[in-house]
Amino acid sequence: MISDLRKKPGVILLSIVLSVVAAASISFAQSRSSAAEHWVATWATSQPLAATSTVGRGGPPPQAQPSQAQIPQTQPAATPPGPEGRGGRGGQPPVPSTLNDQTIRMVVHTSIGGGRVRIELSNAAAAAPLVIGSAHIAVRAKDSAIVPGTDRKLTFSGQPGCTIRPGVLMLSDPVDLEVAPLSDLAVSLYVPKDTGPPTNHNLALHTAYISKGDTTAHEVMPEPNTTRAYLWLSAVDVTAAPNAFAIVALGDSITDGQGTTMEGNLNWTSVLARRLAANKATSHIAVVNQGVQGNQVLRDEAGVSALARFDRDVLSRSGVKWVILLEAINDIIRHGQIDSADPVTSDDLIAGYRQLIARAHTHGIRVIGATVTPVGGQRQVTEHVEAIRKSVNEWIRTSHAFDAVVDFDAAVRDPGHPLQLRTEFDSGDHVHLSDAGNQGMADAIDVAIFRK
C-alpha cells in the first residue's frame, strides 16, 4: 500500500485534504454544540476589581505578610466558626496573605442544577500573575470531603492549568457533572508557587480548607487549616434548560449575608433560591449573590461602587434576566451627615439608581428596586441621615422607574418603632439582619413577577 501511494501523489494530497476537512467538520460541530448550550450562573460572588482601602464598615484590610511555606493567617480545621456561628467581621478569620505550594478547597451552594459545569476565576485585584497548577470540581459530601466518583479535573483551553494575568478573568472548559439544585460543590485549586495577596471575597458563609501540596483530587483534604473566604473563585455556571435564567442580587453586606448562621445558607438570596426551587413554575430560576461588605452606589471605598462593578457583576453573569438592587445604606450612613466633608443627597443616589436601571435595560435585564432597610439604633444615624433614607425609599416606591419593587423596609421594620428593625430580625448591630430577618426579606418578594 505504501509503495502504491508513493506512485500516486494525488492520492496523498486527496487524503490530506479529506483529513483536514474532517477535522474542521468535527471542530465546527463541537463549536456549534458548545454554542447551543444554554449557560446560567448557579452561584457567584463578587471578587474585588482593585485593592481596597477598607473592609466592611471601616478599618484596614489584613496586611500582607512575607511569603511563608506554612499556611498563614488561617485557623485549624477544628476551630468553630465565629461568635455564635454567625457570619461577619466579628470572629471572621483573616484572609490568607499568600498561598504557596498549597491547595484550597472551597464550598459553593448551587441554586439551579445542570448536566455540565464550568467555573470562573478572577485575578482582578492582584499585582502579579496567578499560576493555577491544577483545578478540580466535585459534589461535596461533608466538611472537606467529596462524594466518591464525582471528582472532575478541570482544564483551561485544553490545558491542565493556567496563568491568569492581573485584572483578568478565566473560564474553565466545561465538564460533565450532574449538579443538583440546592447542593454543595467543592472547587479545589492548587497553586504551585507564591501567589502574593490573593484576589478574594472575604465573607464566605462556608468554610474553605487549605492543605499542603496538590491535594485537588483527594476525597478528603489532609490535615487542613481553614479560612472563610473565596480565593479567586468568582462564579460557577451550569448548562440548563432553554427557559432557565438567573437573578442577580446586587448589594452590600446585608445581601452578602453578614449576621446569618455559618454553613446554614440562610441569607435572603439562599432562602429565595429555595422558594423558587420548591415551585415547578419557578424551579428553572437561579439566584446569585453579588453582595459586597460596605458597598456603596456612588463611591469606591469598601470595594468599588455598584456603578463601577455593574458590568462585571451583573451584565457579564451567564443567563441574567433580573437584578434585585439593594444598595445605598452605606452611602447614607457614611456621607449623609449634615456636616459631611463629602456629602451625599437623595438626588445623588436617585441619579445613580437611574444609571443602573438604564444600563440594565440596555441589555434586556429587568430591575427590581428594593427599599433600604432601617438602621435606627446605630450611633451614626441622625435625623438628616434618616431623612435621606426616607426620601430614597419614597422614590423607589413611587417613581415607577423600576420594573418591580420589593419593600424590604416595610417587611422588616418594627411597627411600633419604624426607624428600627424588628427585634427578632436584628442580628444585634441594628443594621444586619438575623436568620429570621433574612427569611422575612425573602418572603417579601413576589416570585410571580419572575413568571412574566
Model-derived segments and their meaning:
Residues 2-4, 12-15, 19, 25-250, ...:
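N-terminal secretory targeting modules
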Residues 197-203, 258-265, 298-302, 335-338, ...:
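Short, solvent-exposed loop/turn and secondary-structure capping segments
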Residues 246-251, 255, 285-291, 321-326, ...:
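Structural recognition of the beta-strand scaffold that forms the well-ordered cores
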Residues 256, 264-296, 304-308, 313:
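Phosphate-binding active sites in nucleotide-utilizing proteins
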Residues 260, 292-347:
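Oxyanion-hole/transition-state-stabilizing segment in secreted/luminal serine hydrolases
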Residues 307, 333-335, 372-452:
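Catalytic His-Asp segment of secreted/periplasmic serine-dependent ester chemistry enzymes
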